[in-house]
Structures are given as C-alpha cells and as structure tokens.
C-alpha cells in the first residue's frame, strides 16, 4: 500500500512546478489536475503573514461568508435563553442551551463545529473557555459569533462562514470549498477570503504583509502563489 501511495504522490508532484509562483487562475486550473483521492477533497489555503501576533495590535482574525459555501455540513451550538434560544432553533441550530450545554462540554461531549453566544451568556461560557479556546471554538465578537442576532449568525455558519485567525508563527489556514466545485466558484471563494484578510492588515504591520501563499487539496502537494497578485486582491 505504501508503495502505491508513494507512486501516486510522485505523479502528483510532477504536475506542480515547485520553483514557480503561480497566478491565481493557473493555480485554480492546476488544482483540478491534482484530484487523486476517492473522497471529495477540500481546497485549502495557507498564508504566512508578516505580523507578530504576540502584540495585540497585530492579531489578524475575523470571519467571512464564502459566496459558494465550504461544501461542509457544519454543526452549530448556540448559547442563548428564552426568545433568543427560540430564534436560534428556528434558524436551524443543532444544539441550543445554557447550563446543560456547559455540562456536556465539561463531560467531553463536543458535537459541534461552531459556537455562537448572546453577549449575556459569555460569563457562563467562561467556565469552559479552557476547553473551547484551544480548539478555536470560543465565541468572539470579531468573528460574529457573539451577537444578539443569533438567527443571522446561525445562517452564516450554516451557509459557508469561515473563521480565520493567525497563529503564533503568523500562519493562517482555511478551507474554501471542495474540488468538486467549478474552478470559477473556488476562485470566487478564494478572492472573498483574501479581500477580507487583506483589509484586516494591522496599521502597525510593516513591510510585505503576505510573505507566502499557497493552495492545495487535502491529499495534494502545495501550489505556491504569486504573493504580489494575492496582496492586490482588495
């Protein structure tokens, strides 16, 4: 099996010029040639930003709703009470609650991909911040997941919202769809994400903002992008 996989990998590597910086259009076309898995692979974006997230004013994070969605089925948990809980349920939230959800999380039951909360419930959520935080699940106003408009937040989450956050090394990783999508739709999702990230450039960030950019499939080698073109997407 290992030999078969290595041959497949070798064949894929021959389709990508590792010395080249691809235009966005070239990269989208090449991605289609790299499909090799039996499942519908995710199209992934990897960026390296010239920021130092140890400084609060250089933390790059946010969210964006991709025009063509992510192709993933997303399970949404909402912390809300009374009328807001009813709104969340009506909007299609998978889990809605308060103290009961806290107990489930403390017991290790994390059966959701995104957490949304009304502002008044954030104190309750503090009890599980150490569990949700490292998993990137803690609600945050910057990603639109702390809000009174829970119905809209649920719709966004279900409709293709991507949350991004730079890690301590300046990297951002995000999925922007499935390889079964038309190339034009993958590109539109990519452009929508990059517009948001480029507009989120901290005023204190100096020099070249995006130092490296690449796209890939779940099982494929990476395609390096022309960062000059990528930074012009605004």
Swiss-Prot record:
Q: Which UniProt keywords apply?
A: Repressor, Ribonucleoprotein, Ribosomal protein, RNA-binding, rRNA-binding, Translation regulation, tRNA-binding
UniProt-listed GO biological process terms: regulation of translation; translation
CC annotations in GO: cytosolic large ribosomal subunit
**Has UniProt tagged this entry with the keyword Ribosomal protein?**
yes
Q: In this UniProt entry, which cysteines form S-S bonds?
A: none
Q: Which InterPro entries match?
A: Ribosom_uL1_bac-type, Ribosomal_uL1, Ribosomal_uL1-like, Ribosomal_uL1/biogenesis, Ribosomal_uL1_3-a/b-sand, Ribosomal_uL1_CS
Q: Which Pfam families match?
A: Ribosomal_L1
The molecular function terms in GO held by this entry are: rRNA binding; structural constituent of ribosome; tRNA binding
Role: Binds directly to 23S rRNA. The L1 stalk is quite mobile in the ribosome, and is involved in E site tRNA release. Protein L1 is also a translational repressor protein, it controls the translation of the L11 operon by binding to its mRNA.
Complex formation: Part of the 50S ribosomal subunit.
Identify its protein family.
Answer: Belongs to the universal ribosomal protein uL1 family.
The protein's name: Large ribosomal subunit protein uL1
- The species this protein belongs to is Sulfurovum sp. (strain NBC37-1)
């Amino acid at each position: 099996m290992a030999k078969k996989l290595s041959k497949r990998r070798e064949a894929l590597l021959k389709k990508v010029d590792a010395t080249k910086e691809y235009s966005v259009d070239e990269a989208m076309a090449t991605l289609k040639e790299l499909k090799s898995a039996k499942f519908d692979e995710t199209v992934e974006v990897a960026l390296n930003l010239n920021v130092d997230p140890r400084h609060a004013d250089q933390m790059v994070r946010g969210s964006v709703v991709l025009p063509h969605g992510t192709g993933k089925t997303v399970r949404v948990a909402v912390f809300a009470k009374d009328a807001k809980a009813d709104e969340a349920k009506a909007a299609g939230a998978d889990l809605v609650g308060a103290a009961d959800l806290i107990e489930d999380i403390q017991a290790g039951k994390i059966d959701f991909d995104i957490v949304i909360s009304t502002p008044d419930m954030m104190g309750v959520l503090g009890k599980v911040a150490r569990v949700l935080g490292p998993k990137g699940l803690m609600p945050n106003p910057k990603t639109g997941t702390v809000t009174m408009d829970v119905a809209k937040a649920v719709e966004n989450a279900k409709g293709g919202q991507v949350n991004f956050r730079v890690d301590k090394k300046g990297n951002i990783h995000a999925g922007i769809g499935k390889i079964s999508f038309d190339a034009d739709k993958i590109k539109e999702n990519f452009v929508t994400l990059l517009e948001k990230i480029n507009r989120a450039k901290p005023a204190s960030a100096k020099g070249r903002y995006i130092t490296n950019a690449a796209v890939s499939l779940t099982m494929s080698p990476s395609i390096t992008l022309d960062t000059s073109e990528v930074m012009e997407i605004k």
